[in-house]
Regions:
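N-terminal glycine-rich phosphate-binding loop for ADP-containing cofactors
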Residues: 1-208
Length: 208
């Protein structure tokens, strides 16, 4: 009835913090935030990399955070931080200083007409955390990295990302590596089998 009449799917999850979709999806967001800083990339640059090019929604990562609400995201992160003290990736479960600063100013994302992104007239601007100010957004992707992402064979695509010295490629490899590793380690704690994980992130976060 849920599937045929409501058009919804059922995800069987174990009783753990954030269940399946949020546990994996929010971890992926945190991995993106961590490696954004590690590789010195811009938020708009990262959204260009983590959207449709890798089978995720156009809103990608930071724009998705704005849509969800930065205060809501911070609450979910705080839940992970306080309830999962033994998680091997616990160091990732923290709200960056720039995120806390936006929340303190009441810049919560789309619902307050400004957060990580902000529209000024006809111009979309994005936060530069180093300067604490917004600048015009530009999702510029290196042509070589874009070429790697067009490779149809996943093995060849991941191998090329791992081998590339370009920061954008190294960033994508690091995020993919961490997310897959996290799923492999935590699967037994959050779901009965791997088949329950894939629909959870497809339906919950729009991943393909």
């Amino acid at each position: 009835w849920v599937v045929s009449r409501l058009g919804k799917g059922v995800v069987r999850a174990l009783d753990t913090p954030n269940f399946v979709a949020n546990r994996v999806g929010v971890f992926s967001i945190l991995a993106v935030m961590h490696h954004t800083q590690q590789f010195g990339l811009g938020f708009d640059e990262v959204d260009g990399l983590t959207g449709p090019l890798i089978g995720r929604p156009k809103s990608a990562t930071y724009r998705t955070a704005d849509v969800v609400g930065l205060d809501t995201l911070a609450h979910v992160v705080n839940t992970m931080q306080s309830t999962l003290p033994n998680d091997p990736w616990h160091a990732y479960f923290t709200n960056p200083a720039w995120l806390q600063a936006l929340i303190a100013k009441g810049a919560l994302g789309q619902k307050t007409r400004g957060g990580i992104y902000r529209k000024v007239g006809a111009t979309i601007t994005v936060l530069d955390p180093a300067k604490g100010a917004h600048r015009p957004a530009d999702r510029d992707i290196d042509p070589d990295v874009a070429g790697i992402l067009k490779l149809r064979d996943p093995h060849a695509r991941f191998a090329a990302l791992r081998a590339s010295p370009h920061p954008q490629a190294r960033f994508l490899w690091a995020v993919t590596r961490d997310t897959l590793h996290y799923c492999a380690v935590q699967l037994e704690h959050i779901a009965d089998n791997a088949r329950d994980l894939d629909p959870a992130v497809r339906w919950g976060f729009g991943w393909k």
